[in-house]
């Protein structure tokens, strides 16, 4: 009887820094019931990848789950596939760290009774030079999407076999994941998957269909718990697939013991198809979606899709400069601590991918994920003495000024308003300026909600869920024309209101906010100055900043004959206390964020007007819209009357 080989795999992951209740919910809704159901079907085989952050949580909170995994490995039902332990995008981290990350997860797999030889490529982000790192880590095969192969020129009917690929004389096997199976499982009735697998029968005993996708699809994604468990989809799937005489269930290692890869291919830099949309800048992403929709309307998409390519994963560092800066700080510290095992463990954690990008999940928009990355960067760097230096840290062609004292790291961008773009506390392991700017995203112009195909059978994938922006969010939606920092200098019309200011409906009279400042280093600090214009009249701003043991002191001198308000804005990463817009007068005020940056105090040498408002971004997630407080803006305001001098002190409490 003709049979088709079928490899079924899942990838289970929770980000570093995720909330404990999220981990608990995902465990109860997906990881635990999935494996307990698998235990009931001894003929069912699964290739599984668990990420390090999730395994650490399971080890500390649900150790019985590790016992179940050991039992399933021993019974031959599980093949463990590894990746970087803390789920980095391997292409985005130094080669030296890749091998350490993979070896660390291989060691965990050994403790479960399995010697792993395969890699689940995080977010399937492939670049050819990864071959050498993977082989150096003792990896024989890697799993990517069929889209990678089609981008290399292979047709769909050539994608039911693994292939070799090579770089620099090193060779590795690459398995293609079948995209059609990704959209069938588990969202459509089991019959649809079986029909598709049966249709692949053609007498070639080496032919293999591969499904390998997020384990969270089996219970965590909206609507899937009821469908997969309560309505019995998973039991039916395991029962029918494992007993079907026309389907030969296999593991990756079993396939490679019986068959050789089909030949040699060279894959381009790629990820899965959706990533090529998400990684584009917003306006280009909108055009990309329009183009895809036009091809679909003309029934040309399936035929020409292989030639439709958008951005690559590393584009996120262009799309989100805050992510780029965080990433380049991670690279900087990785290099500095390479010979310090304790410090290096922190930097390996900081390489967890989720906080660096954004697609259908929150990613870079989730403050608690960024906070976890910054915490580990700061803890790693605290093991080495950096000192003061001037260097292009984020590789944008413009120098940053890095200043360190006993308790803080401060990084200024003279070319961008002379502002303070990082103020990291060694004591608290927080970056006070971990604040994301408000951006227009291409999905803010949303289509009508999509519905499942196949006559409404099954449950919608999160890629199919249309979402309408609620009116109460639309009213508060605003976009920034600039990045957020501390000590940003504004010149405003005297009649400007708080609402105009916070909703970006005001006029910036000066060219100081993003203009270039000259600078000189002083003891424990920096002096910055700019000759510019306000309302087309000459103006000058000087600010002298000195780090102190509990924060910083800045002395301002402002000269302008224009009729204007001068404002100094401090954007602080207040995440756990939901603030409301407010206007008040004060000489001193306190900021208290108990589960975030903690308590700080801002003190002036005179009474001033203060504007406060939450910085809220709109992003999509698997559950709908997230209107997230990225931080709070505090702006102290003074009328300018020829010359203005004042002092501001920031104190960590």
From Swiss-Prot:
The active site is at 123 (nucleophile), 214 (proton donor). InterPro entries: A-amylase/a-glucTrfase_C, A-amylase/a-glucTrfase_central, Gal_mutarotase_sf_dom, GH-type_carb-bd, GH57_Enzymes, Glyco_hydro/deAcase_b/a-brl, Glyco_hydro_57/38_cen_sf, Glyco_hydro_57_N. GO terms for molecular function: 4-alpha-glucanotransferase activity; carbohydrate binding. One of its GO terms (biological process) is carbohydrate metabolic process. Its EC number is 2.4.1.25. It comes from the Archaea. This is 4-alpha-glucanotransferase.
């Amino acid at each position: 009887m003709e049979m088709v080989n079928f490899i079924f795999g899942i990838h289970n992951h929770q980000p570093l820094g995720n909330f404990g209740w999220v981990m608990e919910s995902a465990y109860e809704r997906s990881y635990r019931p999935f494996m307990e159901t698998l235990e009931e079907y001894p003929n069912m085989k699964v290739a599984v990848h668990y990420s390090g952050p999730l395994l650490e949580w399971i080890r500390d909170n649900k150790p019985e789950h590790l016992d179940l995994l050991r039992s399933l490995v021993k019974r031959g039902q599980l093949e463990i596939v590894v990746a970087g332990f803390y789920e980095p995008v391997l292409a985005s981290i130094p080669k030296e760290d890749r091998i350490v990350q993979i070896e660390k997860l291989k060691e965990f797999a050994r403790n479960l009774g399995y010697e792993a030889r395969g890699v689940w490529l995080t977010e399937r982000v492939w670049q050819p030079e990864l071959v050498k790192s993977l082989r150096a880590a003792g990896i024989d095969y890697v799993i990517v999407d069929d889209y990678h192969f089609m981008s290399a020129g292979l047709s769909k009917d050539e994608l039911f076999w693994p292939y070799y690929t090579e770089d620099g004389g090193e060779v590795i096997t690459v398995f293609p994941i079948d995209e059609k199976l990704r959209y069938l499982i588990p969202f459509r009735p089991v019959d649809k998957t079986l029909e598709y697998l049966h249709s692949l029968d053609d007498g070639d005993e080496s032919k293999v269909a591969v499904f390998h996708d997020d384990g969270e699809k089996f219970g965590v994604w909206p609507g899937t718990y009821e469908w997969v468990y309560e309505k019995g989809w998973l039991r039916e799937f395991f029962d029918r697939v494992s007993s079907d005489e026309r389907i030969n269930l296999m593991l990756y290692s079993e396939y490679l013991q019986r068959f050789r890869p089909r030949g040699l291919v060279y894959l381009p830099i790629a990820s899965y198809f959706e990533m090529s949309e998400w990684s584009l800048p917003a306006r280009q992403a909108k055009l990309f979606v329009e183009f895809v929709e036009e091809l679909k309307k003309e029934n040309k998409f399936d035929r020409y899709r292989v030639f439709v390519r958008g951005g690559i994963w590393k584009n996120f560092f262009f799309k989100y400069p805050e992510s780029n800066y965080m990433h380049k700080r991670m690279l900087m510290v990785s290099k500095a601590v390479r010979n310090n095992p304790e410090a290096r463990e922190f930097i390996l954690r900081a390489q967890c991918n989720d906080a660096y990008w954004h697609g259908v999940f929150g990613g870079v928009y989730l403050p608690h994920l960024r906070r976890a990355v910054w915490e580990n960067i700061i803890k790693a760097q605290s093991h080495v003495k950096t000192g003061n230096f001037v260097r292009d840290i984020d590789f944008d062609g413009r120098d940053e000024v890095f200043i360190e004292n006993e308790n803080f790291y401060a990084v200024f961008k003279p070319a961008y308003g002379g502002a303070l773009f990082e103020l990291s506390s060694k004591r608290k392991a927080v970056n006070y300026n971990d604040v994301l700017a408000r951006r227009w995203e291409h999905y803010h112009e949303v289509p009508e909600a999509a519905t499942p195909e196949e006559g409404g059978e099954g449950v919608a994938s999160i890629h199919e869920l249309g979402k309408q922006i609620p009116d109460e969010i639309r009213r508060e939606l605003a976009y920034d024309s600039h990045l957020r920092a501390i000590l940003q200098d504004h010149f405003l019309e005297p009649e400007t209101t708080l609402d105009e200011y916070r909703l970006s409906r005001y006029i910036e009279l000066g060219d100081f906010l993003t203009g270039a400042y000259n600078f000189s280093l002083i003891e424990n600090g920096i002096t910055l100055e700019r000759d510019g214009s306000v309302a087309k009249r000459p103006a000058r701003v000087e600010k002298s900043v000195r780090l102190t043991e509990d924060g910083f002191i800045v002395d301002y001198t402002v000269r302008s004959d224009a009729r204007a308000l001068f404002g100094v804005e401090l954007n602080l990463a207040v995440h756990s206390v939901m603030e409301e817009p407010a206007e008040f007068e004060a000489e001193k005020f306190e900021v208290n964020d108990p589960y975030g940056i903690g308590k700080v105090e801002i003190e002036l040498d005179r009474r001033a007007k203060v504007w406060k408002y939450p910085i809220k971004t709109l992003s999509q997630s698997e559950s709908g819209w997230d209107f997230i407080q990225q931080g709070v803006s505090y702006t102290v305001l003074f009328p300018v009357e020829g010359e203005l001098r004042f002092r501001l002190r920031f104190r960590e409490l």
